[in-house]
Structure formats: structure tokens, C-alpha cells
């Protein structure tokens, strides 16, 4: 729903916060407004705050906290100086132990409200390090004439603006401590107005910055980027258009990979490939998913939305055969190369758009014992409706959006005769409202 700013009353008002929304904002019902819901950024349940309206719509309003009059015992001082402006982290004011409690509650609420299901068991949440964990991301870049400087950072809570960051504490230190240096450097370039974004990604061997540029770089700027990369330990790639235009600045680049030591697996990838952003929690998640799947050494497992083989190749160490299916043909090519690299001949990979009809494809007609899937935010309903689901003794569903998981869980339980054995949250993105989760289904 479109938000209106034309009728905003910026007079601060006092309100009590009743709950925490799925996106990390406090939920209030304003007296004198007919109990209309207001989402208040920077506020926690149980608090009384002074707030200022920032947006209005027919069904709800939005506001930001101006002053906390009565603080929650769960409130802590945010570690980052940019909290409240940058939208990268919205939960830093909530005690870390309570952040995952809130995410667990969001998951269970979605399962019940959207899917009309309840897990037989609530899994203990999966947690890891909460600072310096993010190894992949995208910084927006914008030259702001009024400030006479170039801003580098994530979007502000008002997404029209780029946050003016000096550092980022959730990004790995190799990058997070150098945001200000990156901003100062870009300001010195001839083409400082022609760089809209920079993607970063780190493997075990190197940290890569991929610089999106709208105009060809001058010779001076190319030399400057080379010197900046050498000074700060970055490998620089350039992107003039789509993904196919990404090229190393020096013409050679660097091999990128990360090891999954518990399974003696190494996954190679390219600078714009999808990898899980939190390396240590990724290992915990793989171990957790495999334990929940209970793979047998003589079983065949189907792994949907498999990417580079993040789950597929560790699974190949445990089962007779595993088949991975992924929509991105480039990732499938890398997954096949990774299988060869790791000597795993029992892993097959297929490229397929899993939102389209796949019932005539060879992999769909193969028989499997178990299913693991890790779909995007939109979920997996299209492919679930095509699969011969009764063949799967157990399904493990890894989700990055509790709403789509809940919808798909409702389909599996209420229409296909599965039981939701267990479900729980995983804190892949500490200090954000992002809810990663895992659920286990069995045939009734």
C-alpha cells in the first residue's frame, strides 16, 4: 500500500508499545485514533515512548522513537553509532538473547496464522557470532552535492537515502572497518558520480570488491582502483553492465572458495555468486539440516534450490546418491565443478526453473527417499505442487522467509498428509529482523 506523507502530523505523541512486528518495529495502538495501529521504529514491547509520525496510510501509521520514557529491561545501548539511521540493523537496541526469541516468535506466529499448523517440537534456535559475520553484501554509493561528499553504505530506514557510514560492525572487519576509507577514495575519482553500488564478497583466500560503473573508467581511475585494492587487501573487479560483464581489473582475478571442513568439502565460487553470508552459522546450519534429515548411506536425496552445492556436497558424503537442482545455470556449472573438485561422483546437478512446470524432466521422474530444499524468499509452492511427494519419508525445509515457509507448510500438512515434526529459527543475520528457519516434515 502506498504511504502518504502529505497529511503527516509531526507533533510528538506518547504511546505504549504492545508488541514487536516481523520487521523489528514496535507496535502501538494510538488512543484518539480509534486504536489505529502504528509501527514505531526503535521501540520495544512494554516501553512508553515519545514518537514522531513519519508516514500515514488508511490501515496503519508509521513513526520513529524520539524519546524513551519508560524503557524495557531488554533494551541495550546499540553498539553501532549509525543505529537508528542505517536500515542494515534494526534490532541492536534489543538484548542479543532476546533477538532470537523474537525471531522464534515470528516464525511460530507465521506458521499458525498463515499455514494453520503447529510443530510437534520447537527446535532450539541456532545462533553464532553476532558481530563481524557478514562476508557478502552490497553497498550503495551516492555522490551528494549538498554534502560535497560521496556516501558509501546500506540504505537508510527511508530507502530513498544512503546511510553515511564510517564503519559497519556486522560486516567482516576486512571490509567493515574500511567503509570510510572507501568513501574518501571514491570521492577522489574522476568518475565518482558514475558508481551506484559496490558488491563485496570474501572467500578463504581473498576479499573481492565488484565495482558497478555506468561509464568507462578513465586510465587514472583504473590505476587508482588498483592502488586502493593493493593498499587495503582487496581484489578489484569491474562491472559495466549485467552479470556477464564482470571482469577482474588486472585481467587475471583470483580464485575464490571456502571450505566446509567437517565434510572435507571446498566450494569454489565467483564474485557475484550467491553464498550464505554468515560462514560459521552456515556450517552449523548444514550440520543441523543433515542431522534432521537423518540421511541413510543407501538413500537417494533430492536437494532443490541447491546453488553451489552448499548442502548437496556434504550430503554426498553421507548417502548413496544426491541430486541437486538449481535455476541459475552458472551456479549449476560451478556445482558440477565443485563435485569433481571434491571427488564426489555420486552428486548430480540439473538446471531448472523451479517456478515452472518440470514434470517431464528426467530428475523429476527419478525416485528419492528424502528431500531437502532451501528456496528463495518466494518459497517453493510451485515445485511442491508438482513433486510426487508421497515418495519422501522426510523433508527438511530451510527457509529465509517465515511467511512463505508457513504457506508451504500449510500445503504439506493440510493438503498432502505430512506432519510438521519440528521447526525453529536460525540467527543467520544477527541484529536484523531477518528470520532464517528450518522445518522438518514426515509422512503420516
Curated annotation (Swiss-Prot):
It catalyses: uridine(1939) in 23S rRNA + S-adenosyl-L-methionine = 5-methyluridine(1939) in 23S rRNA + S-adenosyl-L-homocysteine + H(+). PROSITE patterns: SAM_MT_RNA_M5U (PS51687), TRAM (PS50926), TRMA_1 (PS01230), TRMA_2 (PS01231). Its EC number is 2.1.1.190. Gene3D superfamilies: 2.40.50.1070, Nucleic acid-binding proteins, Vaccinia Virus protein VP39. The keyword Transferase applies. It holds the Pfam family tRNA_U5-meth_tr. The active site is at residue 400. [4Fe-4S] cluster binds at residues 80, 86, 89, 168. GO terms for biological process: rRNA base methylation. S-adenosyl-L-methionine binds at residues 276, 305, 310, 326, 353, 374. Disulfide bonds: none annotated. One of its GO terms (molecular function) is iron ion binding. It is an enzyme of class 2 (transferase). This is 23S rRNA (uracil(1939)-C(5))-methyltransferase RlmD. Keywords: 4Fe-4S, Iron, Iron-sulfur, Metal-binding, Methyltransferase, rRNA processing, S-adenosyl-L-methionine, Transferase. Belongs to the class I-like SAM-binding methyltransferase superfamily. RNA M5U methyltransferase family. RlmD subfamily. Catalyzes the formation of 5-methyl-uridine at position 1939 (m5U1939) in 23S rRNA. Residues 5-67 form the TRAM domain. It comes from Stenotrophomonas maltophilia (strain K279a).
Amino acid at each position: 500500500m502506498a504511504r502518504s506523507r502529505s497529511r503527516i502530523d509531526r507533533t510528538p505523541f506518547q504511546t505504549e508499545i504492545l508488541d514487536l512486528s516481523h520487521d523489528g518495529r514496535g507496535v502501538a495502538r494510538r488512543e484518539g485514533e480509534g486504536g489505529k495501529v502504528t509501527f514505531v521504529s526503535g521501540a520495544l514491547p512494554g516501553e512508553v515512548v515519545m514518537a514522531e509520525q513519519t508516514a500515514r496510510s488508511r490501515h496503519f501509521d508509521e513513526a520513529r522513537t524520539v524519546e524513551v520514557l519508560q524503557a524495557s529491561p531488554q533494551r541495550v545501548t546499540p553498539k553501532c553509532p549509525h543505529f537508528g539511521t542505517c536500515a542494515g540493523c534494526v534490532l541492536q537496541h534489543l538484548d542479543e538473547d532476546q533477538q532470537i526469541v523474537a525471531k522464534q516468535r515470528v516464525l511460530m506466529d507465521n506458521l499458525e496464522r498463515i499455514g494453520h499448523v503447529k510443530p510437534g517440537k520447537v527446535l532450539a534456535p541456532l545462533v553464532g557470532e553476532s558481530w563481524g559475520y557478514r562476508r557478502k553484501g552490497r553497498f550503495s554509493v551516492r555522490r551528494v552535492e549538498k554534502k560535497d561528499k560521496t556516501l558509501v553504505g546500506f540504505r537508510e530506514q527511508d530507502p530513498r537515502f544512503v546511510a553515511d557510514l564510517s564503519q559497519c560492525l556486522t560486516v567482516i572487519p576486512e571490509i567493515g572497518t574500511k567503509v570510510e576509507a572507501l568513501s574518501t577514495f571514491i570521492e577522489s575519482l574522476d568518475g565518482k558520480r558514475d558508481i551506484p553500488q559496490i558488491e563485496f564478497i570474501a572467500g578463504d583466500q581473498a576479499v573481492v570488491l565488484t565495482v558497478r560503473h555506468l561509464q568507462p573508467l578513465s586510465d587514472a581511475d583504473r590505476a587508482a582502483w588498483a592502488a586502493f585494492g593493493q593498499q587495503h587487501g582487496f581484489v578489484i573487479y569491474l562491472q559495466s553492465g549485467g552479470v556477464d560483464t564482470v571482469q577482474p581489473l588486472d585481467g587475471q582475478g583470483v580464485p575464490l572458495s571456502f571450505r566446509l571442513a567437517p565434510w572435507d568439502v571446498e566450494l569454489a565460487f565467483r564474485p557475484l555468486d550467491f553464498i550464505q553470508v554468515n560462514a560459521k552459522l552456515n556450517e552449523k546450519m548444514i550440520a543441523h539440516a543433515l542431522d534432521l534429515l537423518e540421511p541413510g548411506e543407501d538413500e537417494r536425496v533430492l536437494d532443490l534450490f541447491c546453488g553451489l552445492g552448499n548442502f548437496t556436497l556434504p550430503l554426498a558424503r553421507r548417502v548413496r546418491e544426491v541430486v541437486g537442482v538449481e535455476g541459475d545455470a552458472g551456479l549449476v556449472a560451478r556445482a558440477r565443478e565443485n563435485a569433481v573438485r571434491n571427488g564426489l561422483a555420486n552428486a548430480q546437478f540439473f538446471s531448472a526453473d523451479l517456478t515452472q512446470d518440470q514434470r517431464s524432466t528426467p530428475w523429476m521422474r527419478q525416485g528419492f527417499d528424502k528431500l531437502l530444499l532451501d528456496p528463495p524468499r518466494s518459497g517453493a509452492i510451485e515445485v511442491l505442487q508438482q513433486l510426487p511427494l508421497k515418495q519422501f519419508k522426510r523433508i527438511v525445509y530451510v527457509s529465509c522467509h517465515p511467511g512463505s515457509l508457513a504457506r508451504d507448510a500449510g500445503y504439506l500438512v493440510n493438503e498432502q498428509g505430512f506432519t510438521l515434526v519440528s521447526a525453529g529459527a536460525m540467527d543467520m543475520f544477527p541484529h536484523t529482523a531477518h528470520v532464517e528457519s528450518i522445518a522438518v516434515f514426515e509422512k503420516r
